[in-house]
């Protein structure tokens, strides 16, 4: 081994790792889970909501933990706001499942458990991809989506300042 390779290796091992370093909280983290789907309403006014729980230590977020209820149309709103105002490429949402909404189906359509679970997983992937993007983390609409009980659809778009 060359002298520079040995010196580089020595430099990596300069500080021994203790249990706090190994098992303590990561320096920066952002965890978002979507869970507990609930179908509410009847007939044409029936829809499914999901709990969106966020935990973070990123200083850009005013709350370190939040839990809000969102429906699919709220995710559509967020996607449209980000596409309109930000410079990031917004991933697609899970599909609308138009065929599942046709009347006189033999199953529950969009209210079938397997479909709700599939959509929940897709929404969780969607929100984690967006929230993990450094530019999206500055968008006011993302903060409102994750941390406000109600979404103010008349808000003024902009960046969040630390």
Swiss-Prot record:
Modification type Phosphotyrosine: residues: 23
Modification N-acetylserine occurs at: 2
Keywords: Acetylation, Lipid-binding, Membrane, Phosphoprotein, Protein transport, Transport
Topological category with respect to the lipid bilayer: Peripheral membrane protein
Region annotated Disordered, chain positions: 1-20
Subcellular location: Membrane
Keyword Glycosyltransferase (UniProt): no
SMART domains, per database record: PX
Domain PX: 28-152
GO biological process per UniProt: endocytic recycling; late endosome to Golgi transport; negative regulation of early endosome to late endosome transport; negative regulation of gene expression; negative regulation of protein catabolic process; negative regulation of protein processing; negative regulation of protein transport; protein transport
Signal peptide as annotated in the record: none
GO MF terms held by the record: enzyme binding; phosphatidylinositol binding; phosphatidylinositol-3-phosphate binding
UniProt modified residues of type Phosphoserine: 73
Main location: membrane
Positions bound to a 1,2-diacyl-sn-glycero-3-phospho-(1D-myo-inositol-3-phosphate): 71, 73, 96, 119
Presence of the UniProt keyword Transport in the record: yes
Top-rank lineage group of the source organism: Eukaryota
Gene Ontology cellular component list: early endosome; early endosome membrane; retromer complex
Domain notes: The PX domain mediates interaction with membranes enriched in phosphatidylinositol 3-phosphate.
Function comment: May be involved in several stages of intracellular trafficking.
Similarity comment: family membership: Belongs to the sorting nexin family.
Name of this chain's protein: Sorting nexin-12
Source organism (scientific name): Homo sapiens
Lineage: Eukaryota, Metazoa, Chordata, Craniata, Vertebrata
Chain's gene name: SNX12
